[in-house]
Amino acid sequence: MARSLVIVESPAKAKTINKYLGRNYTVKASYGHVMDLPKKTIGILLPGEQNGKKKSKRKTKGKGKAVVEKKPVKQVPVTAENIFEPTYEVIPTKLKVIGDLQKAASTAEAIYLAGDPDREGEAICYHLEEILSNPRKYTKVVAEKTAEIAAEADAESEKNGKDGDKPTASAKTTKKAVVQTLARTTAPKIYRVMFNEITQKAIKAAFEHPTQVNVNLVDAQQARRVLDRLVGYKVSPILWDKVRRGLSAGRVQTVALRLIVEREKEVRA
């Protein structure tokens, strides 16, 4: 009999929850967010900003050495409808975690997303649902990301005079997960469960009344993330230029700093 897959944020919770649910459930952790805005670009549709992604191809050249070839893709036109739209991508350090979850999902009877009951937890569940409900698309994404990282690692090894022919351990692990996951082309049913305490009673009640991901909470998290990125990316460089390098601006910290300065001025007046 196939087991149901339960995904929580923290591995510390998994063992206790698994004990309460019993042998018909497998509990795994996402270790927090699995998708985020890109690090190398702003990741938000804005006029004048690069929003196309560069695709990396791992090619073999010469004596079997791997090289990385990057090709720019067409820019997405910014309109009144899509301005400020974020572009999320799989977090590179979560490739193995995602591969493991895809493998578990490929044989699961159902999937229960048990992220924390807040907007961050809802966003994590939303991205997990996106990945696990599109097995063919995201096994390819994971494979391409892993190949890109492996190619960059091989290129770095070659640059440093090391052997760059051997595939990395992460590439081997993910390749195996991809092969196993592609055996299943359709995802099982996916549910959202929430509980405020890790007790048998609370968990049982949550699983008796599963729901769906709350898109309004996801939108709230994305709005916060976009504001954080806009302030950080746009204001921090101005501080570096006008005040001092190394200073940072933030959606909360900059406003808090202004309140402190204004209060200090009142005290000194």
Regions found by a protein language model. Name each.
Residues A2-A150, K159-Q222:
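Intrinsically disordered, low-complexity regulatory segments
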Residues T93, S106, E197-A269:
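C-terminal or mid-to-C-terminal helical accessory/interaction module adjacent to the motor/catalytic core
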